Amino acid sequence: MNINVADLLNGNYILLLFVVLALGLCLGKLRLGSVQLGNSIGVLVVSLLLGQQHFSINTDALNLGFMLFIFCVGVEAGPNFFSIFFRDGKNYLMLALVMVGSALLIALGLGKLFGWDIGLTAGMLAGSMTSTPVLVGAGDTLRHSGIASTQLSSALDNLSLGYALTYLIGLVSLIVGARYLPKLQHQDLQTSAQQIARERGLDTDANRKVYLPVIRAYRVGPELVAWTDGKNLRELGIYRQTGCYIERIRRNGILANPDGDAVLQMGDEIALVGYPDAHARLDPSFRNGKEVFDRDLLDMRIVTEEIVVKNHNAVGRRLAQLKLTDHGCFLNRVIRSQIEMPIDDNVVLNKGDVLQVSGDARRVKTIADRIGFISIHSQVTDLLAFCAFFIIGLMIGMITFQFSNFSFGIGNAAGLLFAGIMLGFLRANHPTFGYIPQGALNMVKEFGLMVFMAGVGLSAGSGINNGLGAVGGQMLIAGLVVSLVPVVICFLFGAYVLRMNRALLFGAMMGARTCAPAMEIISDTARSNIPALGYAGTYAIANVLLTLAGTLIVIIWPGLG
C-alpha cells in the first residue's frame, strides 16, 4: 500500500498540527554550544520549512492557541501584579518600563529607517526581545485593525518572518551580554551580592540545601537542671541558643505541651524539634547519655506545607516580623512568581508569595491561618472559573474606542490578559476560587504557545526565501541593536538614577527581558541567588508590558508617516 504523506497531511489539519509540534519539540532539544534552541524556535523552524512546501492549517487553531497562551500569562502574573504596580515595586516598575519602552522606540525608528512594513517591524521587536507576548499582541491587533485583507495577509506573514529571523539573535546576544556586561563595571556581582547579604542577613548560597526538622528525645539530668539555673522556658530562650524548640514534655508519666512558664525538672523527658545540625550543636548537658526512645513522646506528625500569603496582617510585613520560630515552625523556602527567593529577614511579603514551612501539623495549621492559607494540593482545575474569565476576556476585547475618524479596539490579547490577571489575583485572595494546578497552567500555556507558533510558521513559510534575501542583513543589525541597547540603557538608568545594588539590578534586567537562561548566568556569576529578588520584581509586570508593546507598535505605526 502506497501512502502519500503530503496528501495525508494536507487532508488532515489535526494530524499536520501534531506532526509539526512533535518534530519542532524534538528540534528544540538540540543545543548550539551551551544554548538550547528551545521549544518555541524549534516549532517555528519546522513550521516554516513545511510552510515552504505549502502546508497550512485552519487559522482558528492559531487563534485559540494564542488566546490560551496570553490568558495563562495573565493568570500567572495576577497574584503579584497589583502589589508591584501600586506599592513596593516602584524601581522594578520603572526598570521594566525603561526596558520595554526603549525597545519599542528603537524598533519603530529602525523599521522606518529600513522602510519595513509594520509586520516586519513588530516581528523584529518580538524576536529581538525573545518575547512571544509581543508577537501575540501585535498579531491580534493587526487582525482587528481593519486594513485590507491582502495587506493583512502580508503583514501577518512578515510578522512571523521577522520573529523567526531575530529570535536566536535576541536570545544569544542577551546570554552573551549577561555573561560579559557585568565584567565591564567597577563592582563585580559577587561583591554586590555579598554586600547586600551583609546588609540584610541573607544566605547567599545559590544551592542552599533544605533539610526537614527531626525529633529527638532527651532525659533531663543534673547537668541540664544546673544549666537551666531555675529559669523557665521563656527566660531560657532555648531556640535562640540551640536552634531547637521543646515540643513535648513527659513528667511523671504524663505527656504535655509546655508553655513558656514551664521549668525543667530532674527526670523530665523532653522532645526537641530542630534541624539535624541544630541537634548536633546541642550542649553536652542535653545529649551525653541522655537520649531516650519513647514512642509516645516521639509520635508527632511533622509536615511541610506551602502557605500562600494573603492576610492583611502579613502582607507588607517583613519576614522577620512573622516570628515563625517562636511558633515552633521552620521556614524552608520563599517563592515569588515561581522564583525561589533568598531567605532574607528583610524581604517584604507580597500577596501571593508562597512560604514552605515545616513543623508539627497543628502548629503549621495555626501559623497558616494567621498569615494566609495552605495551598491546595489538588490536581483538579476549576474549569468553571477558567471558562468564565476566558469569556469575560473575549468580551472585553470587543470594546472599541472611536476618536473622530480613527478607531481602535482593545483586542483579544489585552482583554484576555486583563481577565487572566483578575483570575490570578482573585485566586491569591480566595483559596477556594479559581484553583488551577501549576502543572496544568504550564501545560495549557505551553500548548497554546506551540499551536500559535505552528500556525504562524506555516502561514509565513511560503515567503521566507524572498524575505530572507531582501532583509536578512538588516534584520541581523536591527536584532542586535534592539536586543542589547535597551539592556545598556536599563543598566545605566538603574545604576546611576535609581542607584540600585548591582546584583539586584542585573536580576531585574533579566526579569524585564523575561529570559530565564540569562538569569541563570547572572546567578552563576554572582554565585548567589540574590539576583532572583530583582528577577521576580520585574518579571510579572514585564510580561504585561510586553503584550501591550505588541499592541502599541501596531497602533502607533500609521501615525509615524
Swiss-Prot record:
Gene Ontology cellular-component terms listed: plasma membrane
Keyword entries, A-Z: Cell membrane, Membrane, Repeat, Transmembrane, Transmembrane helix, Transport
Sequence intervals crossing the membrane: 8-28, 32-52, 66-86, 94-114, 158-178, 383-403, 406-426, 447-467, 475-495, 540-560
InterPro entries: AAE_transporter (IPR050144), RCK_C (IPR006037), RCK_C_sf (IPR036721), Transp_YbjL_put (IPR023017), YidE_YbjL (IPR006512)
Protein name stated in the entry: Putative transport protein YbjL
Family (UniProt): Belongs to the AAE transporter (TC 2.A.81) family. YbjL subfamily.
Naturally occurring in which organism (per UniProt): Salmonella paratyphi C (strain RKS4594)
Gene Ontology BP term (one): potassium ion transport
Any one GO molecular-function label of the UniProt entry: monoatomic cation transmembrane transporter activity
Domain RCK C-terminal, chain residue ranges per copy: 200-288, 292-373
Primary location group: membrane
Record's subcellular location: Cell membrane
Membrane topology summary: Multi-pass membrane protein
Gene3D superfamilies named in the record: Regulator of K+ conductance, C-terminal domain
